[in-house]
Curated annotation (Swiss-Prot):
It is found in: Cytoplasm. The active site is at residue 463. ATP binds at residues 350-358, 371. This is Probable bifunctional tRNA threonylcarbamoyladenosine biosynthesis protein. CDD domains: ASKHA_NBD_Kae1_arch_bac. L-threonylcarbamoyladenylate binds at residues 133-137, 165, 178, 182, 262. It comes from the Archaea. Its EC number is 2.3.1.234, 2.7.11.1. It catalyses: L-seryl-[protein] + ATP = O-phospho-L-seryl-[protein] + ADP + H(+); L-threonyl-[protein] + ATP = O-phospho-L-threonyl-[protein] + ADP + H(+); L-threonylcarbamoyladenylate + adenosine(37) in tRNA = N(6)-L-threonylcarbamoyladenosine(37) in tRNA + AMP + H(+). The keyword Nucleotide-binding applies.
């Protein structure tokens, strides 16, 4: 094929209940893009019924598409290889193979999740965004680092779209339920307290869903339950995006996926980005949900940069992780120019995290820092006050508690509950993140020993990242706002998973060396074998579908 000319690719999307066919050129012009959604008659999506829908609908859409772009003009066939429902993926792959063989054109299978990111970049001004991808089957925070799109954060159980749809079905709303939840939420005026579960840059939604169902069953107004469900879940999503932003130091945030159509979620993220002084992007609604154009576009990007597939390589991968894809279409040179920005920290602060502003000062005669958990404009007042106060008190308590376990921590000088401030001793040193970037890994085994001591004492940090250790003559642990007491092996396993993913996201080139040293140190904890085994089980449950 002559790749010097403008190529035309047809894309087939069929990972769940939406059937999409799109045609796009290599200069980004969308020639055709149409999606038809399967609406189940009663309950949720049955995989076989969704697959039957694809088999019928692909034929109709293909006929319509080829009236716009003649079949002889198609240069490339692309399809969603995964992740998704097995039966749906198989029908999609079969359709793409059949067309590829009949017109004798190359075929490319692409990652569904990354397709959302790349079509979003095409349709906005985003260059290097941190992406929140939210849909019926996926909830991920993605960032490009080191030739891959890394999963920085995600749901530990169900996806946000699934959460909203399950709640809607419980309340006898039509499918897709998220639209109706949003509609009812607009008329809600009472905030009902529901579980709020953030663990580092991950969230859990199953407990929230169960609690919301119980509130509905207890005769709370449906408008108020929908309002509270949205405020809670979307605040959690916005928070983990903000945490990932602080961790990766990106200067752009992009929202993609079917749930990106929700106006309240867009509003929350927009407010957060303004507060963090970064740019926010959302593609047009047509390109937020599943569609064929995004599949075709990623197919073109991969093909033009050397990707080739044999028919034997086109077997669907239902658990196709974003970070399994080698990104061959982004040049590292693109990230060495003035177009790629980093998040800017205000001059009067020495640090600005996802939760707090950090300033340096003097307390009596001692060097100190003040950590102020600032108001979050994206959260409603009732929820924001509750979270900020609870985490301020919790952090002070745990900083004192870990000292009893022989772990170094800053000394607390003052707690201002009203303004959600903690003043503590200033630690001279560097955060672990900086030490690792310099290539100094000598302290990493100590991190594992420290975590083992915490777990031995029944303390789970819940936000272990390389930004929450300060290395000087000794290693100090900070930022216990999400901490809790727990003897559950799974809680300790998730603690390590949070740290593992934070290391992988920005220290990917040193991951093996860093992680092996940490685990070597963690083996000083008597229950290390049980925790490490549990880690494997939890990682298998991670949602990529």
């Amino acid at each position: 094929m002559d790749t010097s000319k403008d190529l035309i690719c047809i894309g087939f999307e069929g990972t769940a209940e939406k059937t999409g066919v799109g045609i796009i050129t290599s200069n980004g012009e969308v020639l055709f893009n149409k999606t038809i959604i399967y609406t189940p008659p009663v309950q949720g999506i049955h995989p076989r019924e969704a697959a039957d829908h694809h088999a019928e609908t692909f034929v109709k859409l293909l006929k319509e598409a080829l009236t716009v772009v003649p079949i002889e003009k198609i240069d490339l066939v692309s399809f969603s290889l995964g992740p998704g429902l097995g039966p749906s993926l198989r029908v999609t792959a079969t359709t793409a193979r059949a067309l590829s063989l009949s017109i004798n054109k190359p075929i490319i299978g692409v990652n569904h999740c990354i397709s959302h990111v790349e079509i979003g970049k095409l349709k906005t001004d985003a260059l290097d965004p941190l992406t929140l991808y939210v849909s019926g089957g996926n909830t991920q925070v993605l960032a490009y680092t080191g030739k891959k799109y890394r999963v920085i954060g995600e749901t530990l159980d169900i996806a946000i779209g699934n959460c909203l749809d399950q709640f809607a079905r419980h309340c006898n709303m039509p499918h897709p339920g998220g639209v109706y939840v949003e509609k009812y939420a607009k008329n809600g005026n009472k905030f009902i307290k529901l579980p709020y579960t953030v663990k580092g840059m991950d969230i859990s939604l199953s407990g929230l869903l169960t609690a919301a169902m119980k509130k509905y069953d207890s005769k709370e107004r449906i408008e108020d339950v929908c309002y509270s469900l949205q405020e809670n879940s979307f605040s959690m999503l916005t928070e983990i995006t903000e945490r990932a932003l602080a961790h990766t130091n990106k200067a752009e945030v992009m929202l993609v996926g079917g749930v990106a159509a929700n106006n309240r979620l867009k509003e929350m993220l927009d407010i957060m980005c303004i507060e963090q002084n970064v740019d926010f992007y959302v593609p047009e609604r047509e390109f937020c949900g599943d569609n064929g154009a995004m599949i075709a576009w990623l197919g073109i990007l991969q093909y033009l940069n050397g990707k080739r597939m044999d028919l034997n390589d086109t077997k669907p991968i239902s658990n196709y992780r974003s970070d399994m894809v080698e990104v061959n279409w982004i040049s590292e040179n693109e990230f060495n120019n003035e177009n790629i920005k980093s998040r800017i920290i205000p001059e009067h602060l020495i640090g600005k995290g996802a939760e707090a502003d950090i300033s340096k000062g003097i307390y009596l005669e001692f060097e100190s820092i003040t950590k102020e958990r600032v108001k979050k404009g994206y959260r409603i007042l009732e929820l924001d006050e509750l979270i900020r106060l609870r985490r301020t008190v919790k952090e002070a308590r745990f900083l004192a508690s870990i000292k009893e376990l022989g772990i170094y921590a800053p000394s607390i000088f003052d707690i201002d509950k009203e303004n959600k401030k903690i003043t503590m001793s200033y630690i001279h040193g560097k955060i672990a993140k900086e030490k690792i970037e310099e290539g100094n890994l000598n302290f990493c085994e100590d991190l594992g020993k420290i975590i083992g001591k915490m777990h031995s004492g029944g303390i789970v940090h819940n936000d272990l990242t390389t930004s929450n250790f300060i290395v000087s003559d000794n290693t100090f642990v900070i930022d216990f706002g999400l901490g809790k007491y727990s003897d559950l092996v799974e809680d300790k396993a998730i603690d390590l998973i949070v740290l593992k993913k934070s290391i992988m996201s920005i220290h990917y080139d040193k991951f093996d060396s860093v992680w092996n040293k940490i685990i070597e140190g963690y083996k000083t904890y008597e229950m290390f074998e049980s925790v490490l085994e549990c880690m494997k089980e939890v990682e298998k449950r991670a949602r990529y579908l």
